[in-house]
């Protein structure tokens, strides 16, 4: 298991933008991670004060960070950065609210040079919250 210290070693993100709390499962091309969503998240102050919902774009960012942990934990990529290059087929199916535990899965489906394509999904209580195909570039 990869803990928060390992995650912080791999990713440059820090509070309030670090959106991966723990890695539950990891292999060469697949990763499962979690984010504990609490009422203390800064985005809930404005989205929405009387009905707090995690913004969909931040769910996708959490998925991208999940994939980033996998890629940046590899010896050949240590010290590099991962940059978003695109999102396709993104769907939001369930609202993510305070108290939810977001389970994020990313599977690499294609790599060419410094470009990678990932199928990603986020679930809450076994129900699909969001999914999509993410493309990113690995830079130095």
UniProtKB/Swiss-Prot annotation:
The UniProt entry's GO biological process terms, in alphabetical order, are: fatty acid biosynthetic process; lipid A biosynthetic process
Its EC top class is lyase
One of the entry's Gene Ontology molecular-function terms is: (3R)-hydroxyacyl-[acyl-carrier-protein] dehydratase activity
Query: What subcellular locations does the record give?
Result: Cytoplasm
Has UniProt tagged this entry with the keyword Glycoprotein?
A: no
E.C. numbers? 4.2.1.59
Q: What Gene Ontology cellular component terms go with this record? A: cytoplasm; membrane
The record's section on SUPFAM superfamilies has: Thioesterase/thiol ester dehydrase-isomerase
Q: Where is the active site?
A: 47
What InterPro entries does the database record attribute to this sequence?
Answer: FabA_FabZ, FabZ, HotDog_dom_sf
- What is the role of the protein in this entry? Involved in unsaturated fatty acids biosynthesis. Catalyzes the dehydration of short chain beta-hydroxyacyl-ACPs and long chain saturated and unsaturated beta-hydroxyacyl-ACPs.
Which family does the similarity line name? Answer: Belongs to the thioester dehydratase family. FabZ subfamily.
The protein's name in its UniProt record: 3-hydroxyacyl-[acyl-carrier-protein] dehydratase FabZ
- Give the organism the record lists: Streptococcus uberis (strain ATCC BAA-854 / 0140J)
């Amino acid at each position: 298991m990869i803990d928060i210290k390992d995650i912080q070693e791999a990713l440059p993100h820090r509070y309030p933008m670090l959106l991966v709390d723990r890695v539950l499962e990891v292999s060469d091309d697949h990763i499962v991670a979690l984010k504990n969503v609490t009422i203390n998240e800064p985005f809930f102050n404005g989205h929405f004060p009387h009905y707090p919902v995690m913004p969909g774009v931040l769910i996708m960012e959490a998925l991208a960070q999940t994939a980033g942990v996998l890629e940046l934990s590899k010896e050949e990529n240590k010290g590099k950065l991962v940059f978003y290059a695109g999102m396709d087929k993104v769907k939001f199916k369930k609202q993510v609210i305070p108290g939810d535990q977001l389970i994020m899965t990313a599977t690499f489906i294609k790599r060419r040079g410094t470009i990678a394509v990932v199928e990603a999904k986020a679930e809450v209580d076994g129900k699909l919250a969001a999914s999509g195909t993410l493309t990113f570039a690995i830079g130095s």
